[in-house]
Design a protein with these regions (language model features):
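C-terminal segment of N-terminal export signals and the immediately downstream linker at the start
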Residues: 30-52, 59, 68, 392
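Structural motif corresponding to the early beta-alpha repeats
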Residues: 72-207, 218-219, 270, 335
Length: 392
């Protein structure tokens, strides 16, 4: 080895050590500061589900003017170090990370945990995994996570093509194809778990869970927004949806938690699926929980009609005027993130490309910018400017 090569190797090792020590210092700093919720700047933040930090994707998101991202995770990256690495990757590219995952651990998904919602074998193990997940987020300086409490998954019956020619996920409660799915499992009627549960059981199980979560979330400095049932219904396949399918249930659930760290992730699309049975439209939900600083995240989505039969739509193509939601968010001074939700595919033929997402017919992993994301972000930004009363 030449003298020059030796010097280069030593330099490389020093640079590697700097990076490693920097990451360790950041992790330690985040951990020591975890008793306080990480600072999130005021104001509405329009972001996206970020996907993978590939060169093409990062460039596309920059071109769209995106700053804030909501990210996924896998069991392999579900550690404090893994979350910190994800955060650093995105921050190095100029983005800011609002949340990573909706609960993920060694056993897989920690979201819609049937063991927790229905008190099935393995409940305490799942809860401990979830608590560790929240601790890891806090140590990595991630301020937020979404949680959902459905016991038998998200229910759909297929996809339908809308009059404008794109396709959306749909649910027809009268269809024999209606079923719930989550984390690779399928749930069907008449009884998804062999018996009918009572509302009292569902409430007892929620209370047991949230009382364990609150002190950990507060210590970690992580806010948790609870997602509505998708779809809202009094009961599906023997499992009551009595908590997060209606306004009064949400109020009681947040009161039971009694913590500044527990609030609402309002998925507008899911809520609109329920229609009048929810007891409050999205604007009423926003005004109640937003005025109490209990509104942490918004999924901006519309649907064609309330149940018994709906199809997910573009935000300007459903039955609800989404500009009302934006105005309400401005009125309550919402300061969380809002993202386009369940973005359909545009610029392709759903009849020939399957699922309407433009995925078929091209090599796996090939990047394809979805025009729908650009369209939805443009709509959302225009609505926000109008709601804020800004003039050109």
């Amino acid at each position: 080895m030449t003298k020059s090569e030796t010097q280069n190797n030593n330099t490389a090792r020093r640079e590697f050590a700097k990076v490693a020590l920097g990451g360790a210092a950041l992790l330690a700093s985040a951990g020591s500061a975890s008793a306080k919720m990480p600072m999130v700047p005021p104001g509405i933040k329009i972001g996206v589900s970020g996907g993978q930090p590939t060169e093409d994707n990062l460039l596309y998101l920059k071109q769209l003017g995106v700053t804030w991202v909501s990210l996924g995770a896998s069991p392999a990256t579900a550690t404090a170090e893994g979350f910190l690495k994800i955060r650093e990757q995105w921050e190095a590219a100029g983005f800011k990370v609002y949340n990573i995952g909706s609960g993920v651990g060694p056993s897989g998904s920690l979201h819609n945990m049937e063991e927790v919602t229905l008190n099935l074998p393995g409940r305490d193990k799942k809860i401990e995994e979830y608590l560790n997940y929240i601790r890891y987020l806090g140590k990595a300086g991630i301020p937020y996570s979404t949680y959902a409490h459905m016991g038998n998954g998200i229910w759909r019956s297929g996809r339908e093509i809308l009059p404008r020619g794109y396709s959306g996920s749909s649910l027809d409660l009268s269809s024999p194809d209606a079923k719930g799915t989550w984390a690779g499992k399928t749930f069907t009627g008449p009884l998804s778990h062999g018996r009918e549960y009572t509302k009292e059981e569902i409430w007892e199980n929620y209370t047991y869970f949230i009382k364990k979560v609150v002190p950990v979330a507060e210590e970690a400095g992580v806010r948790i927004g609870i997602h509505p049932d998708d779809p809202p219904q009094p009961m599906l396949a023997g499992v009551p949806r009595c908590i997060f399918s209606n306004f009064e249930g949400y109020k009681r659930a947040i009161e039971i938690a009694n913590s500044p760290n527990i609030g609402v992730c309002l998925c507008c699309g899911s809520w609109l699926e329920g229609g009048k049975m929810t007891g409050a439209d999205p604007v009423e939900m926003i005004k109640y929980f937003g005025s109490r600083k209990k509104l942490f995240k918004i999924h901006f989505r519309n649907v064609s009609a309330p149940l018994p039969h709906f199809t997910e739509t573009m935000i300007d193509d459903g039955y609800y005027d989404m500009s009302k939601i934006m105005r309400a968010l401005v009125e309550v001074k919402f300061d969380g993130i809002m993202i386009p939700d369940h973005v359909p595919g545009l610029g392709s033929n759903p009849k020939t490309e399957g699922a309407g997402r433009g995925a078929a017919g091209r090599p796996p992993g090939e990047f394809r910018a979805n025009p729908a994301l650009a369209y939805l972000l443009g709509c959302m930004n225009a609505m926000l400017i109008a709601a804020q009363g800004k003039k050109g």
